[in-house]
Each structure stands twice: as C-alpha cells, then as structure tokens.
C-alpha cells in the first residue's frame, strides 16, 4: 500500500482544492505528514485522511473554519457536541428565514400574474378582507417626487427596508373624491404581510366592499378612471364610503417600460 500521497493526489482523492489544503496547513487545521525541505512539497499519509473526512463532513454542515479549529484545539467531544447543537439552531433559523422568503416570492408571483392577466378598464364589485398597513397621513400632489414621500414613510414609521418590496399605495380622501379633486392625495401606506412586525403607526383597513378598476399607467393617469368609477356609482346608486386605495401593481420596480405599468383603484362603497 502506498505510504505517502502528494498534495495533488489528496486533492483528487477527496475533491478538495489544493489551495484549501495549503490553507488548512497554514492555520494548523490539517498538517501534512511531512514537508520536503528542499522542494517544500507537502506529503500526506492515511493518518490525515480520517481528519480530512471529518473536516469535509463538518464543513458540509456549515461549520466555519474557526469553529473547526476550536474543536481540534480542544480535542474534546463535548466541544463538538456543542458546535453541532449550535449549528442545528442556526440551520433552523435559516430554514425559517428561507420559508419566509419563499412565502414572499409566492405572493409576489401571484400578484404579478394577477396584474398581468386581469382585464383592464373593467369595473368590478369585490369584497376584500381586512388589511394591515403602515400608514402615514401625508399630503402628496401629483407631479411632486413620490420617492421623498416613501423615504418619509420608511423613516417616520421605522419600517424595515425589506418590506418595501410589496404593495405601496396612495389614498385620496373621501371628501376629495366626492369633490373630484383627483390630484391631491391625503396619505401614503404600505400593505403589510402576516410575518411583518408591528410598526409604530400601523392601522387596519377594515373588510369592506369596493369598486375595483385597473388600467395601464400609474398615478398621473388615474383621473379618468376615478370619473368612470363615480359615474358607475351614480348609475348603480352607490355612495363613497371611505378614502380610495390606489396601488401601482406593476411599476419601475419590475419594468422600465412605462407602457407595461398597471395601476389599481379601489373605491369603498356603501
């Protein structure tokens, strides 16, 4: 049986990069059996194979190099047990985080497919469940920079950065809707998801009936669709029952093509 193996041979046998084996030697994690003083070549024996197997196994479990060094420096079974239990907790945390991300992605896919496939310019009567929202009463006039309002929402409500990837909307007060002043928004809000933490100024949009319409474009193109909704309400003897909800479902966060923007107006009715 062969007594010594070159670093290249060990690299091939264990599918470990030569640079990694050199690094393990430098930090004292895996020393070769001996090093040729003239050539500086490293040679390994089968005694190093078992440790290398263990290193590969623990690295596959996600244990960092510094933790492996702690284990081998202590030469204590309890140390390894503690490391594995700690790693188990970390893996469970990461798994829950990945599940949360998966739910967000699934919802986003559903929202985009719904925005792409639902007919435009048609009025529908729908009932929506209650919605948690981060809400800021803030006047916004068409033509002003909405990004400043979004930044203020983030700062004022101490909302985490990641939850801005979702449904951000504007509202026109019921009084302004009735007065047909469609260029003055009274508030900006963000629909929160179930796993989002409570914010400092969270409110609930109650479950209620709405008239819904979707159209190509964004907030500057909304006025004729408000007029269309009001005409429909008059024809069917409905009344405005609250502030509007106006959300751009497909915007610059998804596409650079303005022609692909889709916006939804929800008008509470009674």
Swiss-Prot record:
Gene3D superfamilies on file: 1.10.1660.10, Regulatory factor, effector binding domain
InterPro entries: AraC_E-bd, DNA-bd_dom_put_sf, GyrI-like, MerR-type_HTH_dom, MerR_fam, Reg_factor_effector_dom_sf
DNA-binding region: 7-26
An example Gene Ontology molecular-function term: DNA binding
Matching Pfam families: GyrI-like, MerR_1
SUPFAM superfamilies in the cross-refs: Probable bacterial effector-binding domain, Putative DNA-binding domain
Protein name per the record: Uncharacterized HTH-type transcriptional regulator YdfL
Entry keywords, A to Z: DNA-binding, Repressor, Transcription, Transcription regulation
GO annotation terms (biological process): regulation of DNA-templated transcription
SMART domains in the record: AraC_E_bind, HTH_MERR
Presence of keyword Ribonucleoprotein: no
Highest taxon of source: Bacteria
Keyword Transcription among UniProt keywords: yes
Boundaries of every HTH merR-type domain copy: 4-74
């Amino acid at each position: 049986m062969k007594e010594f193996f070159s670093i290249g041979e060990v690299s091939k046998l264990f599918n470990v990069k030569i640079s990694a084996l050199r690094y393990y030697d430098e930090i004292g994690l895996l020393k070769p059996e001996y090093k040729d003083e003239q050539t500086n070549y490293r040679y390994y024996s089968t005694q190093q194979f078992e440790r290398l197997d263990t290193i590969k196994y623990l690295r596959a479990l996600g244990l960092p190099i510094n933790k492996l060094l702690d284990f081998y420096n202590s030469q204590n079974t309890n140390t390894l047990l503690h490391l594995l239990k700690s790693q188990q907790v970390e893996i469970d945390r990461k798994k829950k985080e990945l599940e949360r991300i998966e739910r967000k992605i699934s919802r986003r896919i559903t929202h985009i497919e719904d925005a792409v496939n639902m007919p435009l310019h048609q009025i529908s009567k729908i009932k929506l469940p209650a919605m948690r929202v981060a809400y800021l009463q803030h006047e916004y006039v068409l033509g002003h920079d909405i990004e400043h309002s979004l930044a203020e929402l983030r700062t004022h409500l101490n909302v985490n950065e990641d939850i801005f990837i979702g449904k951000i909307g504007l509202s026109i007060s019921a009084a302004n809707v009735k007065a047909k002043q469609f260029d003055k928004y009274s508030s900006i809000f963000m629909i929160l998801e179930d796993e989002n933490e409570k914010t400092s100024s969270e409110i609930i949009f109650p479950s209620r009936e709405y008239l819904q319409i979707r159209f190509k474009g964004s907030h500057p193109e909304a006025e004729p669709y408000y007029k269309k909704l009001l005409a429909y309400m008059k024809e069917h003897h409905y009344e405005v029952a609250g502030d509007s909800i106006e959300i751009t479902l497909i915007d610059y966060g998804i596409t650079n093509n303005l022609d692909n923007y889709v916006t939804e107006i929800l008008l509470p009715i009674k």
